[in-house]
Amino acid sequence: MEKSFVMLKPDAVKRRLAGRIIARFEDRGLKIVAFKMLQIPEDLAMEHYQEHREKPFFRDLVDYITSAPVIAMVIEGKDCISLIRKMVGATNPAEADLGTIRGDFALETGRNIIHASDSPESAEREIKLFFDESEICSYEMPDREMIYEE
């Protein structure tokens, strides 16, 4: 099964949206296999967002993501990276469809609630940044055969 890294950003935590967002993933049959709340240190934030280092918004992004706790998760499921990206919606909430997480909850681009891996390579890199292998739990869902065709 494919794994994706998902992070609920400070605005999601401060606005008490975590439970509602997590329920959406579970309602779609996805499985949370790692979960933690943390205050991201600046060096980890800079490494996580390294692809934006030369962009003008980089410093604001680092300041924002380190301003309050986040919830980091590893979510597992069949083709979960593309499914989660569809569920998350467009980066700019004004362009995100209603029914997506950002379309329903996010208010502006700089405070857009959630981060999700955009590729298997990104997922692998991001998971390793936030979780040790021992923190990722494998388990069988009793309703698996109701969710996935074999």
From Swiss-Prot:
SMART domains given in the database record: NDK
Pfam families, alphabetized: NDK
UniProt keyword terms in alphabetical order: ATP-binding, Cytoplasm, Kinase, Magnesium, Metal-binding, Nucleotide metabolism, Nucleotide-binding, Phosphoprotein, Transferase
Annotated ATP binding sites: 9, 57, 85, 91, 102, 112
Names of the cofactor(s): Mg(2+)
CDD domains, alphabetized: NDPk_I (cd04413)
Active site positions: 115
InterPro entries: NDK-like_dom (IPR034907), NDK-like_dom_sf (IPR036850), Nucleoside_diP_kinase (IPR001564), Nucleoside_diP_kinase_AS (IPR023005)
Primary residence: cytoplasm
PROSITE patterns membership: NDPK, NDPK_LIKE
Record EC number: 2.7.4.6
Family: Belongs to the NDK family.
NCBIfam families: PRK00668.1
Protein's name in the database: Nucleoside diphosphate kinase
Organism: Methanothermobacter thermautotrophicus (strain ATCC 29096 / DSM 1053 / JCM 10044 / NBRC 100330 / Delta H) (Methanobacterium thermoautotrophicum)
